[in-house]
């Protein structure tokens, strides 16, 4: 497996030149464009990795699957999806278009920024600190890594420059789609996106989902089976933003990307995969990371379709 991973990384390194690091968050623009790594965890608990698999980077939008799991556990799926939809979108992850166009004004799915902000508001906690503390502890639990923490520099950078997210949140507040204190909810959202992880952490989260919510390391149920199923389904339809259909055709497994360059993926009942490739395509997905997953999926016949 390690030889295969090494070959796949080298085969797809050339794609880095066609992408660029996220620049709209100043701290992210400082990232090394050439980082490339992969980690794979099997249902048998075996781990393989190559490249920059132990380099820390911020989770960004991959945190949306973490908070979605937590919100469903806290509130039940019916309540959560009464506040946010579950349909794919052809618009960008930070677009306001669908919020204005739809009569209900509720966000179209939990993987776009507007939807994730509403989901963050549904995580239980008496204040923003308690909500984020629960998100952080849950991230540690599902990854099996108690050392995961927030990158304060990225958090401050996001908070200072997150004008589009503020606009989305205040627009939803004005239509009644978002309840609660907007700045407190945004604080939770900016913090959750600034959690620092590695490819290895992502692969462990992926394998937990691949195993229907059960840790292959301990045998403990971490997430209810129906929650894992819902999240994997949303990952297939919406996880790669407005490139989700293309990803489903060419790679065919549940996945979620983040503008930090990470992608978490899972091949149900087979393996979890974590990829880092900081150079992004025009959709905000890791360009080399996506190509790595495409080659891995073809080599191991991972597609669920």
Swiss-Prot record:
SUPFAM superfamilies: beta-lactamase/transpeptidase-like. Substrate binds at residues 61, 113, 158, 165, 189, 241, 259. The keyword Cell wall biogenesis/degradation does not apply. It catalyses: L-glutamine + H2O = L-glutamate + NH4(+). GO terms for biological process: glutamate biosynthetic process; glutamine catabolic process. The keyword Hydrolase applies. It comes from the Bacteria. GO terms for molecular function: glutaminase activity. Keywords: Hydrolase. InterPro entries: Beta-lactam/transpept-like, Glutaminase. Its EC number is 3.5.1.2. Homotetramer. Belongs to the glutaminase family. This is Glutaminase. It comes from Clostridium botulinum (strain Kyoto / Type A2). The lineage of its organism: Bacteria, Bacillati, Bacillota, Clostridia, Eubacteriales. The gene is glsA.
